[in-house]
Regions:
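Boundary/junction segments of secreted and surface-exposed precursor proteins
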Residues: 1-18
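Residue-level detector of buried hydrophobic side-chain packing
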Residues: 3, 78-82, 111-113
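Beta-strand elements of well-folded, non-transmembrane domains
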Residues: 7-9, 21, 48, 84-88, ...
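Predominantly extracellular/secreted and cell-surface proteins with exposed
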Residues: 17-93
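Short polybasic amphipathic segments
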Residues: 36-44, 105-114
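A short, sequence-level motif marking secondary-structure junctions
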Residues: 57-63, 97-102, 125-131
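A short, surface-exposed beta-strand/turn
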Residues: 91-110
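Edge beta-strand at a domain terminus
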Residues: 114-134
Length: 134
């Protein structure tokens, strides 16, 4: 799965981080259904914080019944966990990304980061696109 975008920014929802809140976080991703497949990248930025995935520990792809087409991919959801660095400190991440078609406004994101920083964000993309690929 590839893509990126920002969420949530215009709905009044906030993300929580290190005891504070703000509207919006951005992410870019290239993730495989098999954690051993390379490369796997996840970058998340919000406020003055930055998380970078170093190792994808687990990944599972599934189909929640909503069509990600085009193109057909056989799945539309990836969820998993990994380790990385947040603000140069060790951190862990769990995530779930769903491709619900074009242009991406129905795509959903859920990201939880702990360790070097904390972030909890979930919702529909407000800009960008998540794309499932074979």
């Amino acid at each position: 799965m590839t893509g990126g975008g920002n969420e949530p920014t215009t709905t009044g929802q906030t993300v929580t981080f290190n005891g504070g809140t703000q509207q919006g976080a951005t992410q870019g991703l290239l993730l495989h259904c098999n954690a051993a497949s390379q490369p796997n990248n996840l970058q998340v930025n919000w406020a003055n914080n930055s998380f970078h995935l170093q190792q994808l520990v687990s990944a599972t792809c599934s189909n929640d019944g909503m069509s990600p087409q085009p193109p057909p991919a056989g799945f539309d959801v990836i969820q998993g966990s990994g380790t990385g660095r947040c603000n140069k400190l060790a951190a862990t991440v769990t995530f779930k990304f769903a491709d619900h078609g074009e242009p991406g406004t129905n795509d959903t994101v859920e990201i939880h980061i702990t360790g070097g920083c904390t972030l909890d964000v979930s919702g529909n993309l407000q800009g960008g696109d998540i794309q499932a690929h074979n």
